[in-house]
């Protein structure tokens, strides 16, 4: 990647940092000369770009897609990965099972009082699977909308991933919304 200095930018990476960056790794994997060529080729052939990005990011599918995108209804109505089936839990947790990453921290947390904790991929997986089974035992399943109203603690990641694991839809809620907007969101989303 060619280093092009811009005088009005406060911080610029070193050439070494650029050479080892994820964008440079992507440029190399895409088989293009530099960032400008990547942009040009992506603009000319979005299907090539997104297929390349999905492979580079190692996004897994239970069922491979037939076509990466369909823009026939217009750019604002693009359909992605037609025929494919995937799940966020597959890509955040499951694909790392039986790898060195499995025992590494997925979440680091520090309370306002300064207490620190972490959850490894494996520990998070156990909690996600337990909660997913609990949700299923309550009769919740694929396609159901489930409101998630929790503070930013590690358990919110457990709940979010458990909801997604069963194929349900998360309706994220925030205490700053107030009661009436929360009721509207739950009703509009047909939350169970």
What are these regions (language model features)?
Residues 15-61:
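A short N-terminal interaction module
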Residues 38-41, 103, 107-161, 178-183:
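Conserved AMP-binding/adenylate-forming core of the ANL superfamily
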